[in-house]
Amino acid sequence: MYEPVREGEPVRFSLASPEPLPAGLLVHTRHVFGSACGEVAERSPAVPGLQTLSLFGVAGSDASALERLRDELRGPALALGVDCALTRGKMAERGPRLIVSDVDSTFIRGEAIDMLADAAGSGPRVAAITEAAMNGELDFAEALAERVATLEGLSVDRVESIADSIEPVPGADTLVATAHARGCAVGLVSGGFIEVIGGLARRLGVDCVLANRLETSGGALTGRTEGEIVTRERKAEALRRWSEGGRLPGADLPGGSDSPEGSNLPKDPDSPLEARGREGADARSRGFPSPRERIDLSETVAAGDGANDLSMMEIAGLSVAVCAKPAVLAAADAAVTRPRLDILAAILGWDAV
């Protein structure tokens, strides 16, 4: 939950766009930020293909200016199609230490459930349910069960083929690499399926994944899931537990002997999906907290696009709406309005790796 910037608090405001930053917006941004922070350090984060500006300062004593700061900076930028973020405290100084992102239409192109449904012949029906669930019009768990039921009989081989075709949104690899270079961990939370996203998470070096697991029998999907469903509450729980260096039952954590009992993998060791799911747990952590280490929630970022992401966004230090539904955009602290995640690195004030 956003609270006004406090006197003496480090503050950063960053802009990013693939188009030239409007001159009038730059004048406005420098004036508003300077009025609230006095002396300002200015730089342009180096992210290929983006025009950027990042202002850093220490909040002054004008309480009225600080109260209005976020809205006076954010509103004009978004109105002009420029993505932006206001960060504060330690995050303003060095960036976050943990980024947790939704997956479907945020970290990957499209919705995995819709891809599976197209293959199963239930695409239009499932797409309509997905849209309603994303808008918060349906109970997520019930909507998921209804959609997964339409996948009954879809072969494991077809699921593997779809998983192989999954692509991250542009810049996702840059965001992960840049975060790791800064000592920041990256986790994924998804109402989708570990069998679909596990391999991609491993290839990109994602530190931890929480997703649903598909039940299989005889080389095909049964139309059911296994284990506890990933709801908006479980997404928030994952962010909180991971920030504490804790273990979340049902999550794929950094692999090897450290993987917890009950990790989110298919239970059949002979299933072809077992290896694919296991890949998601094999990613080696570069910045993930140990059980003895704690990351304050003020140093976390939650990124998402739908109603199912709002609970984790509410508790994160910075909530980022990524190509989001209007209600999510209105609730978020920051926005990425284009399908490329290197913009998130830029508005955190980071140079891309």
Describe the function of each predicted region.
Residues M1-Y2, G8, G153, R158-G250, ...:
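C-terminal cap/substrate-recognition subdomain and adjoining C-terminal extension
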Residues A23, A63, E67, F107-G110, ...:
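Electropositive phosphate-/nucleotide-binding environments in soluble metabolic enzymes
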Residues P45-F56, K90-R94, D104-L214:
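Alpha-helical substrate-recognition element adjacent to the catalytic core
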Residues D252, D258, N264, D268-D270, ...:
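Intrinsic-disorder-associated, low-complexity terminal segments enriched in Asp/Asn/His/Tyr and depleted
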